[in-house]
C-alpha cells in the first residue's frame, strides 16, 4: 500500500470516471469542522495537485451530506443532504443546478444507474425510495416517482446499488435488517434477503448491499452488527442460503462495500473497527487487511477507471487515497528488529517521538485481473506511432495520433531552418508565463530588431544627460587649452625659498639631487611638488614612489584617487570589484576603454561585474553584461534556476503536471536557442551538464514524437564525448533510418573503389600535409560517400556565378598516361573552378603542366585529360549546380559568406550581352613557393540536371524597420570602361579571382593592406578592358600572389575583337576608374572559421554605415503619402500621442520612448506599403485607437492581447511599441 494523497476533511466522497480521477467531497452529516463552521461546501480534489491542502474547485451546498455520487458521464454530481434535499451540481461550471426537496426526512443514500447516466435512485429515513431523471430536474414542476410497493418493513434506507446488467433492477438495504431487490418495470419489491446467525440464531441486520460487476444474479451484503460483522454473497436463484460467508475480517460492524468493476475477485469493505479489508469473494478469503485508522472508516471505494487506487473516509478527519499494491521491503524488518534489540532506556527516551507507521497485513498475494489481460491489439512504438491490429485480425496498421501537448513544433522547426525567429518571439510574447519571462523575450525581440552589437551599444551606453555633460566638458577643455600659450615663460624677479621648512628641499634641487628632493617633498606632504619632481627626473622608480604616496594618502577618501589608480595601473580590476553597483555603466565604459587589446579579459570582467549585479538583485542588467561578455553559460544558469518557478506557474494553466513540464521545457529550449543564434550564430557547444540534460530531455521527447530531424539538429550541439548523447544520437539515427543507409552506401562505394584500383592499378598515397594525393593515374580518389552522378537531363547551360567552395587537389608531376585507359573526353568543369563562360581564347603555355580532371561519375573509367591544341573548337562549358567529384568532401559553410552575391549600389546602364565565343581549355599554372601547383580541369560538353543550391542568407544583422524580409533588387549593370572592349556584365564582374578555399585548411585571412580599399591602376582607353572572367587555369589566392612574387610571369591573355552587333558608347577615362573601384568593392571576402566567430565589441566598435540595409531609413513624422484616408487616423493619433508624452516622462525613460518611436515607425511603414497587415488587424487597430481616445485603456489592452494571440504572424515588432506607448500614455493621462 502506497499513500498517494491525504485530504484533511471529515466528509463523504465520490470518484469521477476519468482515467486520472478527481475526488468530490462533502462535509459528513453530524461532523463538526475544526473551525466550528456550519457552512457546507462541495469540493473537488485533483490527485495531480502540488498542494493537497487546497481543493481545485468548490461550490457552496444547501446542507451537509450523507452521501455523494457522480454520474457515469461525469456531468452531474448528486448529493444526499441531511435536510431532505437532493442537490445536483455541475462539476465543470462549479455551480448548483437544482435543489429538490422530496423526502420527508434526511436523505441517507443515493446512486446513479450503471446503464443510464441520467437515472438516479435515492433513499431516506422513513422507507422512502425515489427514482429521479436528471434530464428533467431543471423543470420547476418536476417530481421524482416512487420505486413501488414493499413486501417487507423498511425503516431507514442505508444502502442502494444498481444491477450492473439490468438497468431496471436495483437493491436496497435498511435498518430493518432486510436486503430487498426491486424491479422498476413491475414497480415493486420482487425479492428480499435475510440471514440468521448460525451460533445464536439471532437475525443479522443486512445494512449494506452491492451488486456483482458482471453477473445479474449475484449480490453481496454486509452486517453492521458488532457481534456478527459478516460479509455475505448471494445467488438470487437460491436466495435462502448465502453463497459465501466472509468472516474473520472485521471485529466490528461493516459500514461499506465496493465490488471492483474490473475484477470480480476483489471486494473492499470497511467498518467500525477502523480498518479496510480486501477480499476474494469468490473464494471467501482475505487478501489484505489495511492499517487501522484513528476512527470508524465509514466509506471505501475503488476509482472506477483506475482500480489500482481506492479512497477511504474516516471520522478521524482524513480522506486517504492509496494503492492496492503493497511495496514490501527489508527496511521494515530491519527497523522492527532494531526496536526489539533496543535497551529499555532507548525505548522510553524515543517512545514519544516514534511515529505510528502501521503497515498493511498481506495474507495472500493475488494479482489483479487487469494485470494479466494486457491486450496485444495496440502497442505504442518509438516516434509517437501506434501499431494496431485490424478489426479482422489479418492486418496491422501504423498510425501517428495527434496528442494534445505533443504536437510537432512546426513554428520552431521552420524558424531554425530559416534563421528567422520573429514569429516565434511574437508567439512567446503573447503567451508569456510571468513578467521575468516576458523581459527575456523582449530582450530577444530587441536583438532580432537591432542586432546584437547595435542593441548592446545602446543599452550599455551612458544616459543622455551624462553624455551631454561629458561632451560639454570636452568642448570646454578644448577651449581652455586653446587659450593657453604653448610654453610657460617665467617673468619678473623672485627669491629662493630658504625658509626653515623649505631650505633642505631648495638645497637638494640646487644640487640636482632629485631623489633626495623627492623624499624631502614627501616628508613635508608636498605631493604636487613631488609629482613635478618625479616627472622632471624621467626616473620610473621616482615616479612610482610619488604616485604610491599620492594613492596611499587619498585613495581611502577620494573616489577620484581610486579612479586614477586604475588608470595609472591600466587595470580596471579594482573598478569592477569595488565600484558601487549603481555606477555599473561607468564601469562598463572603463572595461571597454582599457581592455581593447585583450578580448578574453574584457569578457571575464564583464561577467564578473554581471555577477555583482545579479547578487544585488539586478537580473535584467546582469543578463546584458553576460550577453556583452559572450557568456551563454551564465545566462543559462539563471534560466535553469528559474525553471522550477516557471513550471509551477504553468501548472495552473495546464491539465497535468507533465503538460506543464513539457511546455516549460520547450519554452526554455526555444529561448536558449534563439539567444545562442543571435550571440554566436548557433555554433555554441554546450558544456554545462544541467543544460545538457535539459536538451537531452527535449531531444528525447521530440524524437519520441517522430520529429527526428529536429532531434538530430539539437544533438549536433551536444558534446560527442557524453555517453548519453552518443546513445541518444544512435537511437535517433536508427529510428530515422539514416545509419543503415549510410553504411550501405559506404560499403558499395568502398567495393567499387577496390575493384577500380585492382583493374587500373591506381593507388592513393597520403601527402605530407594530410591532403589526399592523386593516384598513379593522376586522378584523385573519389569520395566514397558522395552521391552518384546523375545523367544530364538537358544540354542548355545555366550560367549562374558562384563563389568556389572547394578546389580539387592536383599533382605537381606530369602524370603517366595509362595505356589501358579509354581515350580522354572532355568532362564537365567543376563550378568551383570556373565561375562563368569565358569570352576569349587564351594562348597555350607549352611549358605548363598538364592538369587532370575529376570525373563526375565515380563508377566510370577515369580518363586523363590532355591539353587541347590552340584554336580547337570547343563548346563553352555548361555551368550547373553540380560539379565533378573531388578527392575530398566539399567544405560546406554553416555561415553565409559576406559578399556572395553583393550588388552594385549605383545604377548603371544595362549592357548588351555579347555572343559566346568558342574557347579551348588551356592548362595554365602559376608557380608559387611552398604551395602545390594548381592546374585547370578540362571542359565537357555534357551537362547535368542538378541545380545550384540557393545562396546563403546574409548574416549581417542590421536594424530593420519592417517585420517581413525584403527582396533584394536585381543586379545593376556596370558602365563600360572602353569603347573598344567587350561589355562587362554585372554577373561577370562578380567573378573576379577569388581565394581558393581548401576544406582541409582554415581560410586565409584577408590582406590588411587592401582591406576596405582597392588599388586602381592607370587606365588606357585604347586597351582591351580587363575581363572579369576567371581564366580556365586556377589562379592562386590573392594573399599568396601579393606576398610571394612569381619567378615565371603568367602568360598574357590575347585581346579578342568585340563581337558583332555590339552597342558601343564612348566614355571618359574617369568612368574606367569608377568602374574599377566598383569592381573592387563588390569582391567577396573570405569568411572566418565557423567555430571561431569574431568577438564584436558592442560599444567600442565603429559601425559601417554602408552596411545598413535600405529599409533602415528614418521615417519623417509627416511622411505618409501611401497611407489610405481610412488608415490615416491611426498614424495621426499615434504620432500625436508620442509628441504629447515626450515632455512628460522622466529622464530615465527616454530610451523606452525612443524604442516606442522606432516601433511605431515600423507600423507606419507597413501602412504605407500596404504589406503584412490584413484588414482584420487594421480594424482592431482602429478599435484600439477608439478606446484609447476615450481613456478606456483596459478595453484597448484587451484588443491588444487578442492581436498578440491570434494575429502573431502580423503582430511584429510594432505591436510591442503600441503596448509600451499605451502604458506611458495611461501613466501620463492625468498630467
From Swiss-Prot:
Q: Which SMART domains match?
A: WD40
Task: Please give the biological process terms from Gene Ontology that the record holds.
Answer: COPII-coated vesicle cargo loading; endoplasmic reticulum organization; protein transport
Q: What is this protein called?
A: Protein transport protein SEC31
Chain intervals with Polar residues compositional bias = 737-767, 976-998
GO molecular function of the protein, one example?
structural molecule activity
The entry's function note states: Component of the coat protein complex II (COPII) which promotes the formation of transport vesicles from the endoplasmic reticulum (ER). The coat has two main functions, the physical deformation of the endoplasmic reticulum membrane into vesicles and the selection of cargo molecules.
Q: Which UniProt keywords apply?
A: Cytoplasmic vesicle, Endoplasmic reticulum, ER-Golgi transport, Membrane, Protein transport, Repeat, Transport, WD repeat
**Subunit structure, as described in the record:** The COPII coat is composed of at least 5 proteins: the SEC23/24 complex, the SEC13/31 complex, and the protein SAR1. SEC13 and SEC31 make a 2:2 tetramer that forms the edge element of the COPII outer coat. The tetramer self-assembles in multiple copies to form the complete polyhedral cage. Interacts (via WD 8) with SEC13.
Whether Transport counts among this entry's keywords is yes
What GO cellular-component annotations does this UniProt entry give?
Answer: COPII vesicle coat; endoplasmic reticulum exit site; endoplasmic reticulum membrane
- What organism is recorded for this protein? Kluyveromyces lactis (strain ATCC 8585 / CBS 2359 / DSM 70799 / NBRC 1267 / NRRL Y-1140 / WM37) (Yeast)
Q: Where in the cell is it found?
A: Cytoplasmic vesicle, COPII-coated vesicle membrane; Endoplasmic reticulum membrane
Q: Where is this region: Disordered?
A: 725-802, 941-1012
| Lineage start | Eukaryota, Fungi, Dikarya, Ascomycota, Saccharomycotina
Amino acid at each position: 500500500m502506497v499513500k498517494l494523497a491525504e485530504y484533511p476533511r471529515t466528509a463523504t466522497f465520490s470518484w469521477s470516471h476519468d482515467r486520472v480521477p478527481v475526488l468530490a467531497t462533502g462535509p459528513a452529516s453530524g461532523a463538526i469542522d475544526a473551525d466550528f463552521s456550519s457552512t457546507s461546501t462541495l469540493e473537488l480534489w485533483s490527485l495531480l495537485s502540488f498542494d493537497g491542502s487546497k481543493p481545485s474547485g468548490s461550490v457552496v451546498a444547501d446542507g451537509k451530506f450523507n452521501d455523494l455520487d457522480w454520474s457515469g458521464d461525469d456531468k452531474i454530481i448528486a448529493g444526499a443532504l441531511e435536510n431532505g434535499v437532493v442537490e445536483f451540481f455541475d462539476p465543470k461550471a462549479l455551480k448548483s443546478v437544482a435543489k429538490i426537496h422530496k423526502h420527508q426526512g434526511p436523505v441517507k443514500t443515493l446512486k446513479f444507474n450503471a446503464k443510464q447516466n441520467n437515472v438516479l435512485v435515492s433513499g431516506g429515513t422513513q422507507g422512502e425510495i425515489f427514482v429521479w431523471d436528471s434530464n428533467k430536474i431543471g423543470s420547476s414542476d418536476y417530481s421524482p416517482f416512487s420505486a413501488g410497493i414493499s413486501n417487507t418493513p423498511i425503516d431507514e434506507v442505508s444502502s442502494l446499488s444498481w444491477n450492473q446488467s439490468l438497468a431496471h433492477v436495483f437493491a436496497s438495504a435498511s435498518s430493518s435488517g432486510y436486503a430487498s431487490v426491486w424491479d422498476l418495470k413491475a414497480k415493486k419489491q420482487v425479492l428480499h434477503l435475510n440471514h440468521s446467525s448460525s451460533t445464536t440464531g439471532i437475525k443479522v441486520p443486512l445494512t449494506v448491499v452491492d451488486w456483482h460487476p458482471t453477473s445479474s444474479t449475484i449480490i453481496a451484503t454486509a452486517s453492521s452488527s458488532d457481534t456478527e460483522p459478516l460479509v455475505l454473497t448471494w445467488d438470487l436463484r437460491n436466495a435462502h442460503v448465502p453463497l459465501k460467508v466472509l468472516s474473520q475480517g472485521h471485529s466490528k460492524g461493516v459500514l461499506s462495500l465496493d465490488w471492483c468493476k474490473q475484477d470480480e475477485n476483489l471486494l473492499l469493505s470497511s467498518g467500525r473497527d477502523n480498518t479496510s479489508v480486501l477480499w476474494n469473494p469468490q473464494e471467501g478469503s482475505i487478501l489484505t487487511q489495511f492499517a487501522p485508522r484513528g476512527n470508524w472508516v465509514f466509506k471505501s471505494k475503488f476509482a472506477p477507471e483506475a482500480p489500482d487506487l481506492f479512497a477511504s473516509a474516516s471520522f478521524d478527519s482524513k480522506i486517504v487515497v492509496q494503492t492496492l499494491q503493497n511495496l514490501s521491503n527489508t527496511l521494515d524488518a530491519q527497523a522492527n528488529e532494531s526496536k526489539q534489540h533496543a535497551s529499555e532506556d532507548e525505548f522510553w527516551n524515543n517512545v514519544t517521538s516514534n511515529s505510528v507507521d502501521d503497515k498493511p497485513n498481506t495474507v495472500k498475494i493475488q494479482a489483479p485481473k487487469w494485470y494479466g489481460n494486457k491486450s496485444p491489439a495496440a502497442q505504442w512504438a518509438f516516434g509517437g506511432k501506434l501499431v494496431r491490429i485490424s478489426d479482422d485480425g489479418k492486418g496491422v496498421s501504423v498510425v501517428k495520433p495527434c496528442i494534445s501537448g505533443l504536437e510537432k513544433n512546426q513554428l520552431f522547426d521552420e524558424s531554425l531552418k530559416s534563421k528567422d525567429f520573429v514569429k516565434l518571439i511574437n508567439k512567446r510574447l503573447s503567451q508569456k508565463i510571468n513578467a521575468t519571462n516576458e523581459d527575456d523575450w523582449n530582450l530577444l525581440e530587441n536583438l532580432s530588431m537591432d542586432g546584437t552589437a547595435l542593441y548592446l551599444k545602446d543599452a550599455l551606453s551612458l544616459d543622455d544627460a551624462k553624455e551631454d555633460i561629458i561632451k560639454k566638458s570636452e568642448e570646454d577643455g578644448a577651449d581652455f587649452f586653446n587659450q593657453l600659450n604653448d610654453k610657460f615663460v617665467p617673468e619678473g624677479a623672485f627669491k629662493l625659498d630658504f625658509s626653515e621648512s623649505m631650505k633642505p628641499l631648495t638645497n637638494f634641487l640646487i644640487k640636482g639631487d632629485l631623489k633626495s628632493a623627492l623624499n624631502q617633498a614627501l616628508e613635508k606632504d608636498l605631493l604636487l611638488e613631488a609629482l613635478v619632481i618625479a616627472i622632471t627626473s624621467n626616473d620610473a622608480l621616482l615616479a612610482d614612489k610619488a604616485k604610491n604616496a599620492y594613492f596611499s594618502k587619498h585613495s581611502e577618501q577620494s573616489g577620484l584617487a581610486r579612479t586614477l589608480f586604475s588608470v595609472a595601473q591600466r587595470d580596471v580590476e579594482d573598478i569592477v570589484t569595488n565600484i558601487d553597483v549603481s555606477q555599473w555603466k561607468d564601469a562598463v565604459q572603463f572595461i571597454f576603454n582599457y581592455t581593447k587589446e585583450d578580448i578574453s579579459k574584457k569578457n571575464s570582467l564583464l561577467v564578473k561585474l554581471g555577477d555583482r549585479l545579479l547578487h544585488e538583485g539586478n537580473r535584467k542588467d546582469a543578463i546584458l553584461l553576460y550577453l556583452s561578455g559572450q557568456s551563454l553559460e551564465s545566462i543559462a544558469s539563471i534560466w535553469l534556476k528559474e525553471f522550477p518557478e516557471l513550471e509551477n506557474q504553468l501548472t495552473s494553466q495546464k491539465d497535468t503536471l507533465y503538460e506543464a513540464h513539457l511546455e516549460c521545457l520547450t519554452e526554455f529550449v526555444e529561448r536558449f536557442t534563439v539567444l545562442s543564434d543571435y550571440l554566436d550564430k548557433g555554433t555554441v557547444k554546450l558544456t554545462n551538464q544541467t543544460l545538457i540534460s535539459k536538451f537531452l530531455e527535449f531531444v528525447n521527447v521530440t524524437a519520441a514524437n517522430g520529429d527526428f530531424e529536429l532531434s538530430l539538429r539539437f544533438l549536433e550541439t551536444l558534446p560527442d564525448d557524453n555517453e548519453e548523447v552518443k546513445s541518444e544520437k544512435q537511437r535517433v539515427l536508427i529510428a530515422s533510418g539514416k545509419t543503415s543507409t549510410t553504411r550501405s552506401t559506404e560499403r558499395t562505394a568502398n567495393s567499387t573503389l577496390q575493384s577500380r584500383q585492382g583493374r587500373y592499378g591506381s593507388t592513393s598515397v597520403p601527402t605530407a600535409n594530410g591532403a589526399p594525393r592523386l593516384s598513379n593515374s593522376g586522378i584523385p580518389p573519389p569520395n566514397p560517400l558522395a552521391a552518384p552522378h546523375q545523367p544530364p537531363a538537358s544540354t542548355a547551360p545555366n550560367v549562374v556565378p558562384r563563389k568556389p567552395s572547394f578546389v580539387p587537389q592536383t599533382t605537381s608531376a606530369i602524370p603517366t598516361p595509362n595505356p589501358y585507359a579509354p581515350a580522354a573526353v572532355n568532362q564537365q568543369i567543376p563550378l568551383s573552378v570556373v565561375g562563368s563562360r569565358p569570352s576569349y581564347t587564351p594562348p597555350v603555355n607549352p611549358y605548363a603542366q598538364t592538369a587532370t580532371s575529376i570525373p563526375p561519375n565515380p563508377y566510370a573509367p577515369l580518363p586523363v585529360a590532355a591539353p587541347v591544341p590552340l584554336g580547337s573548337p570547343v563548346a563553352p562549358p555548361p555551368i550547373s549546380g553540380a560539379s565533378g567529384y573531388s578527392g575530398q568532401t566539399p567544405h560546406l559553410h554553416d555561415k553565409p559568406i559576406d559578399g556572395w552575391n553583393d550588388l552594385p549600389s549605383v545604377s548603371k546602364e544595362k549592357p548588351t550581352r555579347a555572343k559566346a565565343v568558342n574557347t579551348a581549355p588551356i592548362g595554365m599554372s602559376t608557380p608559387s613557393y611552398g604551395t602545390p601547383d594548381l592546374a585547370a580541369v578540362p571542359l565537357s560538353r555534357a551537362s547535368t540536371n542538378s541545380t545550384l543550391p540557393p545562396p546563403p542568407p546574409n548574416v549581417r544583422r542590421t536594424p530593420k524597420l519592417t517585420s517581413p524580409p525584403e527582396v533584394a533588387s536585381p543586379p545593376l549593370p556596370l558602365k563600360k570602361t572602353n569603347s573598344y572592349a567587350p561589355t562587362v556584365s554585372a554577373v561577370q564582374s562578380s567573378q573576379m579571382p577569388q581565394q581558393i578555399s581548401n576544406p582541409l585548411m582554415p581560410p586565409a585571412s584577408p590582406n590588411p593592406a587592401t582591406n576596405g580599399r582597392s588599388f586602381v591602376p592607370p587606365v588606357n582607353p585604347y586597351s582591351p578592358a580587363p575581363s572579369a572572367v576567371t581564366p580556365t587555369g586556377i589562379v592562386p589566392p590573392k594573399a599568396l600572389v601579393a606576398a610571394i612574387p612569381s619567378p615565371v610571369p603568367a602568360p598574357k591573355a590575347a585581346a579578342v575583337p568585340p563581337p558583332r552587333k555590339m552597342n558601343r558608347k564612348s566614355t571618359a577615362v574617369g568612368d574606367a576608374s569608377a568602374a574599377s573601384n566598383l569592381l573592387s568593392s563588390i569582391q567577396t571576402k573570405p569568411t572566418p572559421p565557423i567555430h571561431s566567430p569574431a568577438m564584436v565589441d558592442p560599444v567600442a566598435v565603429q559601425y559601417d554605415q554602408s552596411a545598413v540595409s535600405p529599409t533602415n531609413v528614418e521615417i519623417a513624422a509627416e511622411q505618409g503619402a501611401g497611407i489610405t484616408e481610412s488608415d490615416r487616423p491611426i498614424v495621426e493619433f499615434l504620432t500625436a500621442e508620442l509628441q504629447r508624452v515626450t515632455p512628460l516622462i522622466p529622464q530615465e525613460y527616454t530610451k523606452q520612448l525612443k524604442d516606442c518611436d522606432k516601433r511605431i515607425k515600423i507600423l507606419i511603414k507597413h501602412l504605407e506599403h500596404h504589406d503584412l497587415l490584413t484588414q482584420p488587424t487594421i480594424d482592431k487597430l482602429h478599435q484600439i485607437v477608439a478606446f484609447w481616445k476615450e481613456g478606456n485603456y483596459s478595453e484597448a489592452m484587451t484588443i491588444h492581447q487578442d492581436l498578440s494571440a491570434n494575429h502573431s504572424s502580423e503582430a511584429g515588432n510594432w505591436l510591442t511599441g503600441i503596448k509600451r506607448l499605451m502604458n506611458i500614455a495611461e501613466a501620463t493621462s492625468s498630467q
